[in-house]
Amino acid sequence: MEAKKIIITGGATRIGSAIAKSLAGYDVDIVIHFNKSKKSAQQLKMELEEMGTKVYLIKADLSNVNQVKKIVPFAYKKMKGLDCLINNASLFEKDDLENFNDKSFSKHLDINLKAPAFLIKDFKRYVRNKEANIINIIDQRVKKLTPFFFSYTLSKAALATLTTTTAMKLAPNIRVNGISPGPTLKNKRQSE
């Protein structure tokens, strides 16, 4: 992928941080979105800038559509263009059929599905007829279903469908792909 003007949601930690590091370079601009990981975002910014990358940070709560709608215009203004959107941010909280609730279910859908949908919509508007890439980070759970992490799994399955339908709609200029990583090291909120 030869992207030079990249947006990465949830780019400050874990997979997002690894993606940013792998795409960094002298002629690359990256907008790193974060919500609660300001310190990690600032540290990553310094690391990437040492590699010659121009880095811009934006804080946004992806469960708030008004904040979501500020990300693409901010990125376009800072980078003077766009050619790649990586929808990496996600909410991953344990629940199941017996104990899920409206608040958690809605928040999973807002962050893991609704935010990427609005970001894709805005990205397409700014890219117009240029060639570009959209990458949605899905999850291997979508292909290997279990009854655990109920709200998360349903939201990621919907993101997989969003990926397929937007790929059909935006082809051939904008290529849309999904990546479904397997297990990663646990985060501080997860148990063994």
Where are these regions (language model features)?
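Conserved glycine-rich cofactor-binding loop
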Residues: A12-R14
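Conserved NAD(P)H cofactor-binding loop of Rossmann-fold oxidoreductase domains
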Residues: N88-E93
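Catalytic loop of short-chain dehydrogenase/reductase
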Residues: N133-A171, P183-K186
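Conserved glycine-rich Rossmann-like NAD(P)H-binding loop of the short-chain dehydrogenase/reductase
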Residues: Y26-Q43
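Active-site loop of short-chain dehydrogenase/reductase
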Residues: K4, T53-K54, G81-L82, Y126-Q140, ...
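The beta1-alpha1 cofactor-binding region of Rossmann-like NAD(H)/NADP(H)-dependent oxidoreductases
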Residues: K38, K59-K70, D102
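Substrate-binding pocket helix/loop in short-chain dehydrogenase/reductase
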Residues: D96-L97, N101-L109
